[in-house]
Every structure is written in C-alpha cells, then in structure tokens.
Regions:
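Polytopic alpha-helical membrane-helix bundles and their juxtamembrane interface segments
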Residues: 1-229
Length: 229
C-alpha cells in the first residue's frame, strides 16, 4: 500500500484523542474530522478513485461518535440514526462478495461462525434487558440493533465461505463493531468507567483501519482467479 504515513498519522492522532478524552479534555473531538480526512485520503491515494459510499459512512460515523462523546442520552436519536445509516451503507461494499459465496455446501464450515453469533446474541440479549428501560427512544434502537447484527452476521459468514486471505479482515471488522456498540451503551447507561470508554474508542479506531484496508483490497478479492469461493 502507498502513502502509509497517512495511516500512521491517523493512528497517532486517534491514540492521542483517546487519551485526551480519557482525561476529559473536551477539545479532543476536534481531532476526529482530521482523522476522517486522513483515513479517507489513505483510501483514495491507494485505489485512485473516490468512494462516496465510504465517504458517507465516515461522515455518519463522525457525527455518531462526536455526539456520543458530547451527550449520548441527549442526542440518542441522532447518534443511532447515523449509526444505522453508516452500517447499512457498508453492506453495499460486501454484497458482491456475498453474491459470489457458495452457501449451499459445506455447512460444517459455518458451525463456528454460527456458535459465535449465538454467543454474541446472548450477550446482546442480556445487555438489552439491562439498559432497555433507560433508553430515551425505542423506535430508533431496533433499526440500529438490526444494522449491527446484519453486519456482524456477514462479517462472520463471508470468511467461512470465501477463504481468500484478505477476507480475514472481516473478523476484525465484525469484532470491532461487536465491541464498539455495546460499550457505548454500557458507558452511558450502566458503568461510566474510563476503561469502558477506552474500549469503545479503541474499537472505533480499529474498525476504520480494518475497514479501509479491506476496501483497498476488495477489487483484488473479487478479481482473484483462485478458487476461494
């Protein structure tokens, strides 16, 4: 990949912002737009074209994350609406991989992903019971939950049915989302510990790194002539 200094600078600013937020230094959120410019620029210089779906995703995620840090309860509808739009928009990118995957044979390969998904669903179910009565709005919560579960499902199933090495990044993407969303709710409604916040912010940082890395390699995955599908 080219221009890796953009990625390194993004990681550096992301780490600085995480520590500043942990010390309750509020101006740290102004670093987030800079981080978005850096990670999107890293994508563009590598693929040599714009990706407006990715730009839309990064913009929605920026709004989601900034207003989560300002006041999640107050801006609950805005945060979850942007989260849902961002997550559903990214299904556009992986859909070509989904269409080419063979789901008709080898269900034994799907056992581990399904068991993992069941474990995640159990954790989410328990978490919903704990926070549900405190949610400011129920109607926006369930579309956001659907978006999260859909994304985790595809991130778990695709690498099991398409063995291309670069698809392994989807496990990290799905895992980052599986950490990010619950920790946002835990921090706001159950346990306002800086440790929980660090987990949430770190997962936000890692999610974008693995996502952009995967999208840079997506054409190579789709055009690969080896029998991975």
């Amino acid at each position: 990949m080219k221009f890796k200094y953009l990625l390194y600078l993004y990681i550096l600013l992301g780490i600085i912002e995480i520590f500043l937020v942990g010390f309750q230094i509020n101006f740290s959120i102004y670093l987030r737009p800079i981080c978005v410019v850096l990670i999107y620029s890293f994508y563009v210089v590598n693929v040599k074209r714009h990706n407006y779906f990715l730009l839309f995703y990064l913009t929605c995620e920026l709004i989601n994350e900034v207003f989560f840090l300002i006041d999640f309860s107050k801006y609950f509808i805005l945060v979850l609406t942007c989260y849902s739009l961002a997550t559903f928009s990214m299904l556009y990118h992986i859909w070509p991989v989904v269409k080419r995957a063979n789901f008709k044979t080898g269900w034994g390969d799907l056992l581990r992903p399904f068991l993992g998904l069941l474990g995640i669903l159990f954790i989410f179910w328990e978490l919903i019971f704990l926070v549900f009565k405190n949610l400011p709005d129920y109607y926006v919560f369930f579309p956001a939950l659907t978006a999260l579960l859909s994304w985790i499902f595809f991130c778990s199933i695709i690498p099991a049915k398409n063995k291309h090495p670069d698809n392994f990044a989807l496990y990290f993407i799905g895992g980052s989302m599986a950490v990010m969303a619950p920790t946002m709710f835990i921090y706001e409604f159950l346990w306002s510990s800086s440790i929980v916040l660090y987990f949430s912010l770190t997962s936000m940082l890692l999610l974008k790194i693995f996502l952009v890395w995967y999208l840079i390699n997506l054409d190579k995955i789709l055009n690969c002539k080896e029998e991975y599908f």
